[in-house]
């Protein structure tokens, strides 16, 4: 029996992906050189690492509880992966009632011996799988579940689907990006799921499907709907027309691209990469306009404020605001915010560009202002939201308030956390308006509807919820297979798309009444 480091790394990589740690999985694969290994093309069932660990524990449990005469001693105590095992059962045949203590070091030694002797085994006693612990109680969504016939499943990808985006102008088009080294542009046949889809165009990022060095990591339509930008694990940004023809191939980054954003007018494309830099590309000719080197670790997210100012965030715990044309090294940044104590996962400008929100693995979301009259020294956040109990992976501003399509409605900030909750905050009062608490697993994606009347949330348990923003009440539910990586509304507010780890996209019809 042989176990290679590449095989172990591949199991860990798949576990990270299946658990929703997309950035971590990309970083791990990049640093372990996993993309250069042939094992990445090996078919692997979901949950493989957990399955192997469970089987190893079962084997250790059998070995620990076998008596000298080959019988199994009954034991009700848990046999954990890391915690010491205390055997509370009495052994038969006058062995007495002394508990058998097996510590972590002893378990590790036994595991090594077991792996060496596994080929000599001729029979393994059947053992029931260990009970699942700390599982939340099931949630009954039958009253609000989306009925059969009101959703469409798109299933031509061959690996996890990480992101989706509806075209802002040609609203029957939706783009999806996957770990199979492709993006796809799907054309919906009609206004409802019953009409299905008419075609799907494949945008290949590698020589063959499934090339893990070409995973599509991010995508976004241009404001005019004519172009689609995609970022890949190979560090290349690509621009396609809406029919799927390649327009530009942008080569400059030295690591995976984590985020792409078009400027408001569509003149520039902004990219943030694992190589610690952000790049502004001129879309008039597909050329590099300016590269910025302010971060000391991978840049995870970027967002424009107008056509020449942007923000970026990084695993270096900082948020940096830059301006096109200002020197890209030294003291050239407009502002640098360093209030977070862990990796900063996302940054978003409010519709009018007056406020910048950031969220972090430190469990906080912060609202910043460049107006030093509001914040004093300008380096302190205007608001510091600390009510979440675990990492905050993403946040979104509502399309309301000044500078938005719905200026009469109050501005809100939504945050989604690994504590399973979505929270809505007021940037005016700094208070939490609603806690949207129904998910039983970490919430990985949220999206306001165009009117901001509703918000959709998707979790790693495959659950999609639609909530009434004003009342903070869940009104629709849909359960798909696998974990949800992203949710997105169409422009008409009649459909919500959710992309899954099961290689599929669900397009759900939404009827307000």
Predicted regions span which residues?
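Blade-level signature of beta-propeller repeat domains, shared across WD40, Kelch, NHL, RCC1
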Residues: 485-513
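WD40/WD-repeat beta-propeller blade N-cap
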Residues: 154-161, 203-216, 251-257, 293-299, ...
